[in-house]
Amino acid sequence: MRDQHNGKIVNISSIAARRSAPAMGIYGIAKAAIEMLTKVLAQELAPFNIQVNAVAPCMVRTAFSEPFWSNKDLHEAIVKTIPLGRIAEPIDIAHPTLFLCSSGADFITGQILLVDGGASAI
């Protein structure tokens, strides 16, 4: 990317970088570190026309999060924290990520895009 003076890096963070939850401490710390790395790399790589951003989703229906969304009580509790009233599907994260990889995002760098169904608004 440096040699080509062009590139896009999109890291995957999480709402857990901003919102604490029991038993999620290490995960949240790791995601917060990814967000800081995103901002630092954005500054370091900008002279090479490389944009570095991150997408920070809320709960996404994946195998990793299955213990949370497959439990009816936990699922209901999680959905109550998301104004759009559902957990995210992988495609909900894919589209914003693809945008950040496109030429439409050429002037966006060092940003953390919250894709959380409005959860960070409350």
What kind of region is each of these model predictions?
Residues S14:
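Residue(s) in the substrate-gating loop at a strand-loop-helix junction
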Residues A17-R19, A121:
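Conserved catalytic-site region of short-chain dehydrogenase/reductase
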Residues R18, V52, A56-P67:
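Short, flexible catalytic-loop segment of classical short-chain dehydrogenase/reductase
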Residues S20-M24, I29, A46-P47:
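Active-site "substrate specificity/gating" loop of NAD(P)-dependent dehydrogenases
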Residues M36, A54, E76-G104, I108, ...:
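C-terminal helical subdomain
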Residues Q43-P47, D106:
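Alpha-helical segment proximal to the catalytic Tyr-Lys
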